[in-house]
């Protein structure tokens, strides 16, 4: 984003980014071309390219927006917890709550993770994001929460990377379950996940 952007230009970027999230969630990453995103935004493709330069830069903006909205939900919840178990529970409940309030964002970031290949083979995790987002990510990182629990004796000796992967997989499965069955009970699922993982981590 150019530092000299006007308020109107910033608003247009935000609109295009929102339309890109919707298009990727609805059509899939491969089918969400710049032209289709432009059509959804009601602008010419040249307008999208004026604001973002190329699709890779647009995708980077989408990723940053998805992370920003996710961390807005998760950071306060995790920070409010006083124990590792509380932080783990808050992480799970907040992320599943995000699926409820921002379903398109979660589907879009998953689509990008599975399908995006930028210039030089760049993947989702290689895309540049605002340094503040990296700071927020560290505050809710599962490996950190689990490692802290092990260090303090609150959790049993465990491999934080393995348990973190299992938690992420379980949260991701909730997204697919909700797509298949819009009535899927995310709150009940959150209760079950919290119970299962706190039992799995208990000393």
What are these regions, as identified by a protein language model?
Residues 1-11, 22:
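N-terminal intrinsically disordered/low-complexity leader segments
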Residues 47-48, 81-83, 104-120, 132-135, ...:
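Anionic, Ser/Thr-rich low-complexity intrinsically disordered regions
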Residues 12-21, 37, 62-66, 70, ...:
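Generic hydrophobic, amphipathic alpha-helix propensity
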Residues 71, 75-76, 108-110, 118-152, ...:
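Amphipathic alpha-helical packing segments from all-alpha helical-bundle domains
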Residues 16-24, 95, 197:
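Short hydrophobic clusters on alpha-helical segments that form packing/core surfaces
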Residues 61, 75-105, 163-167:
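Hydrophobic alpha-helical connector segments
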Residues 15, 23-57, 61:
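Helix-turn-helix
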Residues 1, 94-97, 136-152, 156, ...:
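C-terminal peripheral helix-coil segments that are non-catalytic and often amphipathic
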């Amino acid at each position: 984003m150019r530092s000299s952007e006007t308020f109107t230009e910033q608003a247009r970027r935000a609109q295009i980014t929102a339309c890109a999230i919707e298009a990727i969630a609805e059509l899939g990453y491969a089918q969400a071309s710049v032209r289709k995103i432009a059509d959804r935004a009601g602008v010419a493709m040249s307008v999208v390219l004026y604001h973002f330069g190329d699709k890779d830069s647009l995708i980077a903006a989408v990723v940053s927006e998805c992370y920003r909205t996710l961390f807005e939900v998760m950071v306060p919840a995790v920070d409010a917890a006083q124990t590792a178990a509380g932080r783990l529970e808050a992480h799970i409940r907040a992320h599943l709550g995000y699926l409820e309030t921002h379903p398109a964002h979660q589907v879009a970031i998953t689509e990008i993770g599975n399908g995006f290949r930028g210039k030089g083979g760049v993947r989702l995790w290689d895309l540049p994001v605002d340094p503040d987002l990296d700071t927020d990510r560290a505050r809710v990182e599962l490996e950190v929460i689990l490692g802290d629990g092990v260090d303090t004796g609150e959790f049993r000796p465990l491999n934080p990377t393995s348990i973190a992967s299992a938690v992420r997989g379980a949260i991701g499965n909730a997204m697919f379950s909700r797509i298949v069955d819009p009535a899927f009970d995310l709150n009940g699922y959150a209760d079950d996940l919290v119970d299962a993982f706190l039992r799995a981590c208990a000393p």
